[in-house]
Curated annotation (Swiss-Prot):
The gene is walR. It comes from Staphylococcus saprophyticus subsp. saprophyticus (strain ATCC 15305 / DSM 20229 / NCIMB 8711 / NCTC 7292 / S-41). PROSITE patterns: OMPR_PHOB, RESPONSE_REGULATORY. This is Transcriptional regulatory protein WalR. Residues 4-117 form the Response regulatory domain. The modification 4-aspartylphosphate is found at D53. GO terms for biological process: regulation of DNA-templated transcription.
């Protein structure tokens, strides 16, 4: 069954080019040209991945991303004409998985689509082998088989990538991991982003799992090196 892709771009010629090339690759493609229609289309079609322009009439891409993330966890690739660090970081903080700056190569974008689909929907063998092992860290319990986490009995809503990052750190408790290592291991060697992606995801995780994100007791920073998950008796 073909993977579904939703393309959201107010520039119809760009959307048409992406639709044509994605269909050539065997994907089922749906297009929207403004933010309001994009949300409706994503809710109706429940695609496997979304290509989302930031500058849109109606709701902008950031608002669409925020709204979609309330319900879905499919990969979202942000398309932007702004080569701005602020836009990239904000998009990642809202739950985007990747970003591409216009003008972009259609071949590169399709490669990113394939890479994001592969990372999101394929579990490494080692994850399957130990999936039944619950991990307890103080007040937090990780359920790898259900891709879920509870804190003091309450569910913590994590994105797919947030869960993978926290689960990976939990399996290497107390071991400092560099940003580069986490990017390669959790996001994959074919990920096109930079290490700032790790920082943004860590920040989102802390906001969800820490009682006081400014003074974390679970995910700790080793300044100048990376991050580790604090051991608790």
């Amino acid at each position: 069954m073909a993977r579904k892709v939703v393309v959201v771009d107010d520039e119809k010629p760009i959307a048409d080019i992406l639709e044509f090339n994605l269909k050539k690759e065997g994907y089922e493609v749906f297009c929207a040209y403004d933010g309001n229609d994009a949300v409706d289309l994503i809710y109706d079609e429940e695609p496997d991945i979304v290509l989302l322009d930031i500058m849109l009439p109606g709701r902008d891409g950031m608002e669409v991303c925020r709204e979609v993330r309330k319900k879905y966890e499919m990969p979202i690739i942000m398309l932007t004409a702004k080569d701005s660090e602020i836009d990239k970081v904000l998009g990642l903080e809202l739950g985007a998985d990747d970003y591409v700056t216009k003008p972009f190569s259609t071949r590169e974008l399709i490669a990113r689509v394939k890479a994001n689909l592969r990372r999101h929907y394929s579990q490494p063998a080692q994850e399957v082998n130990d999936a039944s092992n619950e991990i307890t860290i103080k007040d937090i319990v990780i359920y790898p088989d259900a891709y879920s986490i509870k804190k003091r009995g309450d569910d913590i809503e994590l994105t797919h990538r947030e869960f993978e990052l926290f689960h990976y750190l939990s399996k290497h408790m107390g071991q400092v991991m560099t940003r580069e290592h986490l990017l390669q291991t959790v996001w994959g060697y074919d990920y096109f982003g930079d290490v700032r992606t790790v920082d943004v995801t860590i920040r989102r995780l802390r906001e969800k799992i820490e009682d006081d994100p400014s003074h974390p007791e679970y995910i700790v920073t080793r300044r100048g090196v990376g991050y580790f998950l604090q051991q608790h008796e």
